[in-house]
Amino acid sequence: MALKTFKPITPSLRQLVIVDRSNLYKGKPVKQLTEGKSSSGGRNNNGRVTVRFRGGGHKQTYRIIDFKRRKLDMPAKVERIEYDPNRTSFIALIRYADDELSYIIAPQKLAVGDEVISGQQVDVKPGNAMALANMPVGTIVHNIEMKIGKGAAMVRSAGTYAQVVGRDQGYVIVRLNSGEQRLIHGQCFATVGAVSNPDHMNASIGKAGRSRWLGRRPHNRGVTMNPVDHPHGGGEGRTSGGRHPVTPWGKPTKGKKTRTNKSTDKFIVTSRHKSKKKG
């Protein structure tokens, strides 16, 4: 998909750059594969704000995506590629040989009419899903499971991919986009190829209103607030905050390590931080 620019007849159109979605299906999603979705506005079940600067936006219908791909050894044909407001990638509607319909994350180079299949050992081509242990070293993958049968958890955003770089005693070493190398069980499934819509990162929203359509409210800095609202707030006139940068809850930000899950440290072969320092 290409990027789309506009004749600058207004200030917002001058900087607006969006992904050209003219090739996508223009109708409604399959009703049996959708469900309602209520907007939380960034609030939890107590009604308290847990994610700031969220709210409003266009109403969305949730599309049920098959992240498990456990309908093994049954070919499916790609019926159409669709837009999904709930994620940055595009989705593909596939029809299995027994006429069952399903949505999957669309990888790059997947076209209408293509055939996809999932199984323990299948052809290495975009859209096919199989166990990591059976993939050749060097394969580009996405939709990676972290626990066997739980469904894809990693590498699902637009344009992302990981690479199988080695094997180690029933585990597979996968290099992620961040540079991190991680051990994942060989029986975890992954899908061949990179995720669709790589141009998403080059889009420019163009105006504040488009951000509001996406459900994003204005993001204001702590240093512009009052002392009651943020540790950086207050002061006479403009101030620098007067302390090292912290979150609204007083925890150090900008570089402070926050990872505490020591039980899974053994699965990280190379930290993403170390790989950056080497570069």
Swiss-Prot record:
Residues 36-49 have a biased composition (Low complexity). It comes from the Bacteria. One of its GO terms (biological process) is cytoplasmic translation. InterPro entries: NA-bd_OB-fold, Rib_uL2_dom2, Ribosomal_uL2, Ribosomal_uL2_bac/org-type, Ribosomal_uL2_C, Ribosomal_uL2_CS, Ribosomal_uL2_dom3, Ribosomal_uL2_RNA-bd_dom. One of its GO terms (cellular component) is large ribosomal subunit. The keyword Translocase does not apply. Gene3D superfamilies: 2.30.30.30, Nucleic acid-binding proteins, Ribosomal protein L2, domain 3. SUPFAM superfamilies: Nucleic acid-binding proteins, Translation proteins SH3-like domain. Residues 29-49, 202-279 are annotated as: Disordered. GO terms for molecular function: rRNA binding; structural constituent of ribosome; transferase activity. Residues 209-220 have a biased composition (Basic residues). Keywords: Ribonucleoprotein, Ribosomal protein, RNA-binding, rRNA-binding. One of the primary rRNA binding proteins. Required for association of the 30S and 50S subunits to form the 70S ribosome, for tRNA binding and peptide bond formation. It has been suggested to have peptidyltransferase activity; this is somewhat controversial. Makes several contacts with the 16S rRNA in the 70S ribosome. Belongs to the universal ribosomal protein uL2 family. Part of the 50S ribosomal subunit. Forms a bridge to the 30S subunit in the 70S ribosome. This is Large ribosomal subunit protein uL2. It comes from Beijerinckia indica subsp. indica (strain ATCC 9039 / DSM 1715 / NCIMB 8712). The lineage of its organism: Bacteria, Pseudomonadati, Pseudomonadota, Alphaproteobacteria, Hyphomicrobiales. The gene is rplB.
